[in-house]
A protein has these predicted regions:
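Flexible, low-complexity junctional segments that flank or bridge functional domains
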Residues: 1-263, 271
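C-terminal "post-core" interaction segments
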Residues: 1-13, 17-31, 185-188, 200, ...
Length: 397
C-alpha cells in the first residue's frame, strides 16, 4: 500500500537546525491556523482538551528531536478527528522497504524490496524492543480520533513502515533503520533490519501473494477494465477518481461489445480524487444502463482503503443504483468533513492539511458504509493469490 500522505516540507537538516524559539513559534502558528481554518475544529475533541495537548507539547519542545515534534503536531491535528486533517509526511520521511497488512490479529509483511525476501509473509512480533501491540497503540495516537477502526488500523499499518514515525514515537533509536522481530508460519522467530529508502527512491516490490490477484496487478492509468470471459463478467479496477473519461468510455464499449452478465467496480485501493468525476463517468452511466443496473448484475468492491471520493461514489452507487456492495466496511465515515486544503508552517515548512466542508452521504443511525455482503480476506487465501470477495461475486448466479 502506498501511504496517502505526501508533502512539500523542507529536508530534515533544515528542521534539525531550527531553534527552540522557532519551534515554539511554529506550534503557536499551527494551533491557531488549524483551529481557525477548520470549520468545526472541536466537534470531536473539546477545546479544553485540544488546548491542553498544545500546552503539553509546548512544554516539551526544548527536549524533543524534530521527529518527535512532528509526531506531536500530527497527534494534535488528529484530535480534529476527520481523515483529511493531519500533518503531511515530508519527502524525507524515511520510508522503510516493506508493507504491512492486517489479517485477524496478525500483522503480516505482504511486500518487500529486493534483498528482504525472507521476511515475506511473516508475522511481526516486535519492532526494536517494543512488542507489536504496544507499537500499534503508540501509532494509534497519530490517527483521526473520529474515524472507524478500519481506517485507523490501515494508518497504523502504514505508520509502522515509516522511519520518521517510528523514531518520533520512540520505538526506534533513529529514523534510518528499524529492526523487526518476525515469526514464520512454523513459529520460528528471527530478526531483520530494514534500512530506509532514500527520498524519492522507487523500488520493485516483491509480493507475498502468488500469483498476484487481478486487483493488485499494476495499472497504466487511473482505471482499467478486464472482461472475464468464463464468468461473463466485466471487472473494472478504479484506483483513483481522476482522469476517468477514457476508462469510462472503455467500460461502456466493452459492455456494448460483450454484453456481460455482471459488472464489477473495484474501489478497494482507491484513495479518492473528485467524486463529481466518479458520479459523471461511473455512477450515472451504469445507473442508466438497464441491462446492468439490476440486482445481481452490478457489484461494487469496497474496503477500509476506499477513501474520500471513492467512499462518496460507493455511497452514491448504493443510493442511485441497484448495486450490491461487497467486501469490508469503508474506513472513512460517510458523514464527515472533506474537501481538504493546506497551509505551511513558517519555520519547519511542514505542510498541514485540513478539511473545509461537511458532507452527508448516508442516512440512518450508523455513520458507516458497510457492505451488503461482507467478505474478509484470510491470510491463507491471500497468500495463494485468491481474491475471496471477487470470487464470491463470480460465483453468484
Amino acid at each position: 500500500m502506498e501511504l496517502h500522505r505526501v508533502g512539500n516540507a523542507v529536508p530534515l537538516d533544515r528542521q534539525a537546525g531550527l531553534t527552540t524559539a522557532q519551534w515554539h513559534e511554529d506550534l503557536t502558528f499551527f494551533a491557531t491556523q488549524l483551529t481557525s481554518l477548520h470549520p468545526d475544529a472541536f466537534a470531536n475533541t473539546p477545546k479544553a482538551k485540544f488546548d491542553a495537548a498544545v500546552a503539553e507539547l509546548d512544554g516539551k519542545l526544548d527536549h524533543l528531536n524534530p521527529d518527535e515534534i512532528y509526531v506531536g503536531l500530527d497527534r494534535i491535528a488528529n484530535l480534529i478527528g476527520d481523515g483529511h486533517t493531519y500533518v503531511d509526511f515530508p519527502p524525507d520521511s524515511a520510508n522503510l522497504p516493506l508493507d504491512i497488512m492486517r489479517f485477524g490479529a496478525d500483522s503480516r509483511i505482504d511486500m518487500v524490496a529486493p534483498g528482504y525476501e525472507r521476511a515475506l509473509g511473516t508475522r511481526i512480533v516486535a519492532i526494536q524492543d517494543t512488542p507489536l501491540a504496544s507499537a500499534r497503540e503508540l501509532a494509534a495516537t497519530a490517527t483521526p480520533v473520529a474515524e472507524t477502526t478500519g481506517l485507523r488500523d490501515r494508518r497504523i499499518d502504514a505508520h509502522l513502515t515509516i522511519g520518521m514515525m517510528l523514531h518520533g514515537l520512540g520505538v526506534t533509536p533513529s529514523r534510518d533503520s528499524a529492526r523487526y522481530l518476525l515469526a514464520d508460519d512454523d513459529g520460528k522467530q528471527f530478526t531483520m533490519d530494514f534500512k530506509a529508502l532514500a527520498p524519492g527512491e522507487r523500488t520493485k516490490w516483491i509480493h507475498a501473494a502468488s500469483p498476484l490477484p487481478l486487483a493488485e496487478q499494476p495499472l497504466d492509468g487511473s482505471a482499467a477494465c478486464t472482461y472475464l470471459r468464463p464468468a461473463n463478467t466485466l471487472y473494472c479496477n478504479v484506483r483513483t477518481i481522476l482522469q476517468l473519461e477514457k476508462p469510462s468510455q472503455q467500460m461502456l464499449e466493452l459492455i456494448h461489445l460483450e454484453h456481460p452478465a455482471k459488472v464489477v467496480i473495484d474501489l478497494r485501493q482507491n484513495g479518492g480524487g473528485d467524486y463529481n468525476l466518479g458520479l459523471q463517468y461511473l455512477v450515472r452511466p451504469l445507473a442508466e444502463d438497464k441491462s446492468i443496473n439490476r440486482k445481481g448484475h452490478l457489484f461494487i468492491l469496497i474496503g477500509p482503503d476506499s477513501f474520500s471520493a471513492a467512499m462518496s461514489n460507493a455511497a452514491q452507487f448504493r443510493t442511485m443504483t441497484r448495486a450490491t456492495l461487497v467486501g469490508e466496511p469503508i474506513g472513512e465515515r460517510p458523514n464527515t468533513y472533506q474537501e481538504p486544503r493546506e497551509f505551511t508552517i513558517p519555520n519547519s515548512r511542514l505542510v498541514v492539511r485540513y478539511s473545509t466542508r461537511f458532507y452527508r452521504f448516508a442516512t440512518g443511525p450508523e455513520n458507516i458504509i458497510a457492505p451488503d455482503k461482507q467478505v474478509v480476506p484470510s491470510w491463507t487465501d491471500y497468500k495463494a493469490g485468491r481474491d475471496d470477495a471477487l470470487e464470491w461475486i463470480l460465483e453468484q448466479k
